[in-house]
Amino acid sequence: MQPTKVLVIDDSKLIHTMFSAMFPKVPLVHAMDGMDALRRLGEHPEVDLIFLDINMPQMNGLELLDRLKADEVLARVPVVIVSTEGKEQDTVRGLQKGAAAYVKKPFRSEAVRELVGRLPEPALP
């Protein structure tokens, strides 16, 4: 897929910086946790790819994923889980809840871009 607007949800500013460098020509929307992500999605409903951390304050990634998949429009947007080593259970749960793929931290930029290229385009409503 060729994303046109990406939402990055992670409580690490370093991760946001890395994604900005990885996708310099793609507008990124940044959120620090699940609640912040819901606010940002209200402001930017046209995102077509989401990178989602699992362990965050206020609302974790799995809770947010449930909300995204319950929404008729947002359920079509591919979600890529970004998780740390040793959190395989959370990754498996995320895939069971409908995430399209996962990336383990630390990750290589080339591997993430390659993964995004293999994702299918979001289904049209």
Set out the residue ranges of the language-model regions.
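Acidic, metal-coordinating helix/loop segments flanking the phosphotransfer/catalytic sites
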Residues: 30-49
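Short, conserved "switch-loop" micro-motifs in signal-transduction and mechanochemical regulators
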Residues: 85-86
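Two-component/phosphorelay signaling modules centered on CheY-like receiver
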Residues: 13-30
